[in-house]
């Protein structure tokens, strides 16, 4: 009788472990407790699906079988690579041609009082918990970010209705490894709106569906103004 395969769990050699966590950057008090905040669900019923389905996507793998449509990038081109490859931190992004095809989405995104980095729409194919956990990771959001500036975090807006899917989150221990007991699950119905310190928290999307999940991911610089804006959205 064959043994049941062990479920994957990150170890000390995982690439995310080397990403720094303890730095002097400004961090928002609203994020301190759990490392994530769930905001009020957005009514996006007025936004047609063409604003995410008809964009130019890149075959870019991160957190599963994914494709990304950049709305803002380092230089305004349809590019997914890290800003540091151009010697920049993940801020001061320029909007891409895709942004012109998503006017309603962009109206809301531009209303967020923050310095933007990457803004992308993710297209994630279905994946179970056991499949997703193999892609759990932390983001290197703050590479080259000056230490006297704001810590870069990420914000999500769910575009498709996937109430049985969720963002799987784990806090980090003193060795930068995920703490199993800290597991949190953020549901992903249409309009779900949440912000994650994705350099602190290990994360991955579990998508229990039979169609792709679409969501906007927005890199933003932490600031007192953004902190108050998030509180107002809770």
Language-model features, listed with the residues they occupy:
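Structured loops at beta-to-helix junctions and adjacent beta-edge loops in soluble globular domains
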Residues: 71-74, 124, 160, 197-199, ...
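Catalytic core of non-heme Fe(II) oxygenases with the double-stranded beta-helix
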Residues: 113-194
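Histidine (H) residue identity feature
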Residues: 11-14, 25, 129, 137, ...
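Non-heme Fe(II)/2-oxoglutarate
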Residues: 5-121
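Intrinsic-disorder/low-complexity, polar/charged segments enriched in Ser/Thr/Lys/Arg/Asp/Glu/Gln
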Residues: 35-39, 152-154, 215
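Catalytic core of Fe(II)/2-oxoglutarate
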Residues: 168-234
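Alpha-helical and His/Cys-centered functional microenvironments
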Residues: 18, 141, 207
